[in-house]
C-alpha cells in the first residue's frame, strides 16, 4: 500500500512538473508569435493601396512615333504627339464638322508641301507659324547650302533657287508614293493669333518687298467690307476680319491668288483629314516640338532648328484682345465659324472671351 502511494505521488509530481514546463515554454515563445501576427496585421492595414493600372490605350500603328528611341526622361513626350494625331482623327470623323475639317488634296494643297527626297521628308507650309526657319532646315538637308546661316533671306522664299521642290511637281504615282512612305509634318498656332500675325506682317509692317498686299489686296478688301465709305485710312484689322468671316469670301480669294496662304485655314493648306501626318507641331511648344520633329525624322544629328527668341512662342491673350477690341460680336462669331475646324482639330480653346 505504501508503495502504491509513493508511485501515485511520483506520477503526480511528474505531471505537475510537466505542466510547469509547458507554461514556461508558452510564456517564453508566445511573444514573438504575437508580435509577428501584429506586424502582419499592421502591414495589411497600412500598406498603400496598389491601384490597378489602366489598360494600355491602343495606339494605331500609324500614330506611333517613327523615329529613334528616346531616353527615359523623354519617354512620356511622344504621348503628347500621339494624342494630337488621335484628336485629329476623332474630329475628322465628326460629321457635324465635315465642311470645316475636310478638303480635297488639290494642287493648291500639293503646292504647300515641300519635299526633301534625300531624307524622305514632306513639310506642309503654314505661313505665320515660323515656316521660314523650317524651310531653311530643309534647304540645308537638300544640300543647296551647308548651313542655315549661309542662306540669304531672299532665297528662302524663292522656290526657283532654294532647291525645295513642291509635291505638286511630281507625277501622280510619285506623289502617292511619297505621301504613303515619307515622314510628314506641319506646325500650327492659335488660329486667331496667326491671323493677327498675318495682318501685321502683310498690311502693317510688310518687311519684304511685297507691294501687292497694300496696293491691290488691301484696297479690294476695303471696297468690299468697309462700312464707313468716307474713311480714308488704310486697311484696318476690322476690315480684315469682315473679309475672312464672310461666307462669300471666295470670290475675292480667287482674285488674290496664292497670296491668301497667309490667312486661309490649316485645313485648306494641309488637308489633315485626308493626309495622315507623322507629327503636328505647335508654335506654343516649339522649344520641345522642334527637337522632337528632328529626332523623329532621323535628322537631329545633321541639323538643328535655329535658336528661338525668348517669349516669341508664348500665346498673348492681351494682344488678341487688343486687336479685336471694338469689332462687333457678330463679325467675330462669323470669323470663328470659319476657323472652328482649326480650333477643334488642333485642340485650341474656343475664345469665349471674344465671342460672349
Curated annotation (Swiss-Prot):
Keywords: Carbohydrate metabolism, Glycoprotein, Golgi apparatus, Lipid metabolism, Membrane, Signal-anchor, Steroid metabolism, Transferase, Transmembrane, Transmembrane helix
GO CC, one annotated term: Golgi membrane
UniProt family annotation: Belongs to the sulfotransferase 2 family.
Pathway annotation: Steroid metabolism; Protein modification; carbohydrate sulfation
Lumenal side: 28-356
EC number: 2.8.2.-
Name of this protein: Carbohydrate sulfotransferase 10
Coiled-coil residue windows: none
Positions that bind 3'-phosphoadenylyl sulfate: 127-133, 189-197
Protein task: Catalyzes the transfer of sulfate from 3'-phosphoadenylyl sulfate (PAPS) to position 3 of terminal glucuronic acid of both protein- and lipid-linked oligosaccharides. Participates in biosynthesis of HNK-1 carbohydrate structure 3-O-sulfo-beta-D-GlcA-(1->3)-beta-D-Gal-(1->4)-D-GlcNAc-R, a sulfated glucuronyl-lactosaminyl residue carried by many neural recognition molecules, which is involved in cell interactions during ontogenetic development and in synaptic plasticity in the adult. May be indirectly involved in synapse plasticity of the hippocampus, via its role in HNK-1 biosynthesis.
Known glycosylation sites: 99, 228, 316
Annotated consequence of substituting residue 128 to A: Loss of function
